[in-house]
């Protein structure tokens, strides 16, 4: 959710606001009835605390607890808000009378603690809530669910668990602008830019995702990283790279089988200061094409390039400007290029084609073709966005 050095940060590090362009906006209405007056009681068939009965990929059980089964799928033990000592929200969360269509995976960008206790997990959940409410001004925790490095799973925003168990409605979150109703947000404690999640966290993540998919009818292919939709490092390079594996393992828990091709999604590369190579050079040509960069592209993502990205983001009304070239800015920057044109956008195509030794390029280079040239092709990442009226707080 945040970035290194900002334990619980969201806004100020991520690019907020609605995604520019002609993205699909899904219909849906806010739940019109009064919300519950108290944290709803767990269902009679709900899970009970205890060690997990579901072995992880390494054969070891995770600590989140998953004894009961629902339609053959393990039910994780998820601590409700009152169990980890949550504050009362500033005002009741909104509940939408619709199901989410995907899951977004985040990391907290906090410390990779070695304290795997339930007490440490609860302290972390409270710290996130305090930051979101006191620094960001949100009504409650932004994410729907939180998983600690010890594998303990907790409800994030109030009523998220009750609505998940019901399987028909969703609590409006604040974990990613444009994805706060149509996507369930899961925070994973730690920073995963250079290390992998703990086995306990990983096991709880896959079990929790499988249960969410079951209750809401979400396909296991519809698991994404925060960076797929925003200009952010989240959920870290290592955790993001593990998403194809996560999709396959979640599918397995649901009794399905996904091939490596089916579990791979087309993405936009995340470019940042210090990167080098043809992708950076192509991006520089596109930035010059857009009027945001002057001078000769040299394939180095330096301060000049970061400033150009920031200028482009400002021009496209990003709420936050951070100089990271990721899933929000690429679709705006990589415009359609047609054969026969001789401009900087066409030169960007030539740079990538030469780097990948592509002998022929289609007459029209659109987003899927750009992603092939960038080497990140796969099944498309859908651009569906939240319905109108989402508060993003």
Question: Where does each model-flagged region fall?
Answer:
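C-terminal extensions
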Residues: 339-358, 391-393
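Extracellular-facing binding/remodeling surfaces
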Residues: 285-298, 316-319, 351-364, 380
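Surface-exposed patches in mature extracellular/periplasmic domains of secreted proteins
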Residues: 135-144, 215-227, 295-297, 321, ...
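Active-site acidic/histidine clusters and adjacent loop/turn architecture
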Residues: 98-137
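Basic/polar, cationic surfaces and motifs that engage anionic cell-wall
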Residues: 2-8, 18, 26, 33-97, ...
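Second-shell loop/turn segments in exported
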Residues: 110-119, 190-199, 267-274, 294-297, ...
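Short, solvent-exposed linear patches
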Residues: 367-371
């Amino acid at each position: 959710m945040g970035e290194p050095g900002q334990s619980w940060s969201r806004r100020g590090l991520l690019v907020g606001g609605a995604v520019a362009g002609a993205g699909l906006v899904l219909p849906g209405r806010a739940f019109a009835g009064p919300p519950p007056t108290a944290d709803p009681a767990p269902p009679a068939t709900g899970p009970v605390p205890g060690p997990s009965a579901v072995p992880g990929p390494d054969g070891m059980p995770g600590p989140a607890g998953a004894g009961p089964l629902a339609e053959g799928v393990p039910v994780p033990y998820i601590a409700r808000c009152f169990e980890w000592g949550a504050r009362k929200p500033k005002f009741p969360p909104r509940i939408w009378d619709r199901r989410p269509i995907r899951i977004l995976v985040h990391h907290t960008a906090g410390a990779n603690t070695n304290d795997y206790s339930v007490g440490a997990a609860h302290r972390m959940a409270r710290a996130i809530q305090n930051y979101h409410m006191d620094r960001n001004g949100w009504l409650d925790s932004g994410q729907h669910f939180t998983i600690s490095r010890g594998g303990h799973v907790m409800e994030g925003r109030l009523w998220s668990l009750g609505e998940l168990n019901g399987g028909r409605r969703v609590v409006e979150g604040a974990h990613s602008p444009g994805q706060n109703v149509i996507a369930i947000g899961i925070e994973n404690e730690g920073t995963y830019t250079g290390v992998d999640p703990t086995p306990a966290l990983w096991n709880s993540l896959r079990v929790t995702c499988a249960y969410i998919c079951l209750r809401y009818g979400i396909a296991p292919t519809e698991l994404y990283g925060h960076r797929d939709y925003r200009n952010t490092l989240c959920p870290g390079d290592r955790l993001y790279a593990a998403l194809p594996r996560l999709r396959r393992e979640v599918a397995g828990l649901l009794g399905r089988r996904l091939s490596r091709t089916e579990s791979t999604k087309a993405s936009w590369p995340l470019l940042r200061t210090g990167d080098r190579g043809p992708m950076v050079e192509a991006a520089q040509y596109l930035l010059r094409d857009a009027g945001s960069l002057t001078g000769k592209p040299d394939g180095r993502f330096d301060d000049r390039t970061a400033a150009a990205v920031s200028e482009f983001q400002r021009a496209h009304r990003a709420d936050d400007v951070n100089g990271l070239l990721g899933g929000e800015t690429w679709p705006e920057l990589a415009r359609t290029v047609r054969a026969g044109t001789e401009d900087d956008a066409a030169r960007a195509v030539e740079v990538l084609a030469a780097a990948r030794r592509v002998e022929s390029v289609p007459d029209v280079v659109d987003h899927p073709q750009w992603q092939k040239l960038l080497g990140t092709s796969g099944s498309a990442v859908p651009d569906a966005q939240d319905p109108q009226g989402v508060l993003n707080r």
